[in-house]
């Protein structure tokens, strides 16, 4: 497996938190925090994919690389596929890692962990999950659960993703973390597929891959990064990063 290419899709048109990638956290735009964490993962080159000049400018001002993509992509995966062809048209990278641009507190170590399942040639897509500890999250439809069985140390094979509380019975529930490592061929196949029945019902893009028979494995990690979707999330991220700076 060649060095992975890390791509960070970032767009300004968020409904709940406008201009989210440029939101100030400790004097630095949020997208810069995410880019720095991805660089610190140390697994391969990092590129921000955006449809907005302002986002590209703040990354390039700090010595990073950004590429401009079309503004009309229906999903982050489609933006990822376009950016991959711009950055690596010769196919030198056979793995691409999609790090969401709204994870400013993400631990670089879990970005590095995300590619581990791809050492198994049967795995098409790799992702992450963490044990749910807070009871209120178990029934929260905004907390996506992964249902799977153990295939190795701290590793699950995904059988389903759902917003419902699942699976039933004793044992841990797992919070899916929306970070993906794709084989290049798997990404090309994925974005060419039509939306699946379960994908449309659950509003979960990854179900398209499972419905098509693609294999997704997940590493179980301890750190659950904060996804910034609302003004309240942004304030929490500011607090968390301020504490880290003090320590």
UniProtKB/Swiss-Prot annotation:
Keywords: Cytoplasm, Lipopolysaccharide biosynthesis, Nucleotidyltransferase, Transferase. PANTHER family: 3-DEOXY-MANNO-OCTULOSONATE CYTIDYLYLTRANSFERASE, 3-DEOXY-MANNO-OCTULOSONATE CYTIDYLYLTRANSFERASE, MITOCHONDRIAL. It catalyses: 3-deoxy-alpha-D-manno-oct-2-ulosonate + CTP = CMP-3-deoxy-beta-D-manno-octulosonate + diphosphate. Belongs to the KdsB family. CDD domains: CMP-KDO-Synthetase (cd02517). HAMAP family: KdsB (MF_00057). It is found in: Cytoplasm. Pathway: Nucleotide-sugar biosynthesis; CMP-3-deoxy-D-manno-octulosonate biosynthesis; CMP-3-deoxy-D-manno-octulosonate from 3-deoxy-D-manno-octulosonate and CTP: step 1/1; Bacterial outer membrane biogenesis; lipopolysaccharide biosynthesis. GO terms for biological process: CMP-keto-3-deoxy-D-manno-octulosonic acid biosynthetic process; lipopolysaccharide biosynthetic process. One of its GO terms (cellular component) is cytosol. Pfam families: CTP_transf_3. Its EC number is 2.7.7.38. Gene3D superfamilies: Spore Coat Polysaccharide Biosynthesis Protein SpsA, Chain A. This is 3-deoxy-manno-octulosonate cytidylyltransferase. Activates KDO (a required 8-carbon sugar) for incorporation into bacterial lipopolysaccharide in Gram-negative bacteria. Coiled coil: none annotated. InterPro entries: Cytidylyl_trans, KdsB, Nucleotide-diphossugar_trans. One of its GO terms (molecular function) is 3-deoxy-manno-octulosonate cytidylyltransferase activity.
């Amino acid at each position: 497996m060649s060095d992975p290419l890390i791509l960070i899709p970032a767009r300004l048109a968020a409904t709940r938190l406008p201009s989210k990638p440029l939101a100030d956290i400790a004097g630095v735009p949020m997208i810069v925090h995410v880019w720095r964490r991805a660089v610190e993962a140390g697994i391969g080159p990092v590129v921000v994919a955006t449809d907005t000049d302002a986002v590209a400018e703040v990354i390039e001002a700090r010595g990073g690389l950004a590429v401009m993509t079309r503004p009309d992509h229906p999903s982050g995966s489609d933006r990822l596929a376009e950016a991959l062809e711009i950055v690596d048209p010769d196919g030198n990278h056979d793995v691409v890692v999609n790090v969401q641009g709204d994870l400013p507190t993400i631990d670089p170590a879990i970005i590095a962990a995300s590619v581990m399942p791809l050492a198994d040639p049967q795995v098409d897509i790799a992702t992450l999950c963490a044990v749910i500890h807070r009871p209120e999250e178990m029934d929260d439809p905004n907390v996506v659960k992964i249902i799977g069985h153990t295939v190795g140390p701290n590793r699950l094979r995904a059988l389903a993703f759902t917003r419902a509380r699942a699976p039933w019975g004793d044992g841990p529930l797992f919070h899916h973390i929306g970070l993906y490592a794709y084989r290049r061929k798997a990404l090309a196949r994925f974005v060419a597929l039509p939306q699946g029945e379960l994908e449309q019902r659950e509003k979960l893009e990854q179900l398209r891959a499972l419905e098509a028979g693609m294999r997704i494995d997940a590493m179980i990690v301890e750190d659950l990064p904060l996804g910034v979707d609302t003004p309240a999330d942004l304030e929490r991220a500011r607090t968390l990063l301020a504490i880290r700076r003090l320590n």
